[in-house]
UniProtKB/Swiss-Prot annotation:
ATP binds at residues 41-48. Residues 5-231 form the ABC transporter domain. It is found in: Cell inner membrane. This is Lipoprotein-releasing system ATP-binding protein LolD 1. Coiled coil: none annotated. Belongs to the ABC transporter superfamily. Lipoprotein translocase (TC 3.A.1.125) family. The complex is composed of two ATP-binding proteins (LolD) and two transmembrane proteins (LolC and LolE). Part of the ABC transporter complex LolCDE involved in the translocation of mature outer membrane-directed lipoproteins, from the inner membrane to the periplasmic chaperone, LolA. Responsible for the formation of the LolA-lipoprotein complex in an ATP-dependent manner. One of its GO terms (molecular function) is ATP binding. The keyword NAD does not apply. Its EC number is 7.6.2.-.
Length: 234
């Protein structure tokens, strides 16, 4: 199995004047292609910091990070931004859709060149993805007219637009009611199983973690548990 994530000795230290806070303390982590993993831990455990480093939003203080075999922790800011846009997909607790853009335009947005328009091929891809997430009847609806669950499904389609190596989901169900959350989780399961998409999901919800094939537990900046469950996400 190809490793999508390979992190070695990841540390992160934040400085505030003379004060030094060690948030991550030597994280070693691999995530294989096609895995669906949940990352859990109490507030302050380092989950969000590790997710930001893997998502190339923060640089580690020490350690190395490779994604799909490519070393990324030492890339320039310009190359990090390019890699992030082209090779990673993101789903957040709050969908961050453009309210006046249609569902199709929101999905296609990551593929559009800065200052450029949306090509016919991009529109076709976006429509196909919206159909994939069950929103073929909402393609031309402005995002502001969609329900919370529908908006999060648009966000998942958007994350898939550039065929990313890895989809990073930060509390993707945290702003949804239970029924909508279950539908979003079911959709992630389908995309993971049928398309082989690799997911890393950060969550406080034990119900979400229990349905994933792997559970990573962080405590006080360390990876304290790494459990695989082949029956997860049933």
């Amino acid at each position: 199995m190809t490793n999508v994530i390979e992190a070695r000795g990841i540390e992160k230290v934040f400085h505030n004047g003379d004060e030094e806070t060690r948030v991550l303390k030597g994280i070693d982590l691999t995530l294989g292609q096609g895995e669906l993993a949940a990352m859990v831990g109490a507030s302050g455990s380092g989950k969000s910091t590790l997710l930001s480093i893997i998502g190339l939003l923060l640089r580690p203080t020490a350690g190395t990070l490779s994604i799909s075999g490519e070393r990324v922790d030492d890339l320039s800011e310009r190359m990090r931004a390019r890699f992030r846009n082209q090779r990673l997909g993101f789903v957040f607790q709050f969908h961050h859709l453009l309210p006046d853009f249609t569902a199709m335009e929101n999905v296609a947005f990551p593929a559009a060149a800065p200052g450029g328009g949306i090509s016919r091929a991009m529109r076709t891809r976006a429509r196909d993805l919206l159909a994939r997430v069950g929103l073929e009847d909402r393609i031309d609806f402005p995002a502001a007219r969609l329900s919370g669950g529908q908006k999060q499904r648009v966000a998942i389609a958007r994350a898939l637009m550039n065929r990313p190596d890895l989809i990073i989901a930060d509390e993707p169900t945290g702003n949804l009611d239970r029924e909508s959350a279950d539908r979003v989780l079911d959709l992630m399961r389908e995309v993971n199983r049928e398309e082989g998409a690799t997911f890393l999901i950060c969550t406080h919800d034990d119900g979400v973690a229990a349905r994933c094939g792997r559970r990573l537990t962080l405590s006080d900046g360390r990876l304290t548990s790494n459990v695989r469950d082949p029956g997860g996400f049933s």
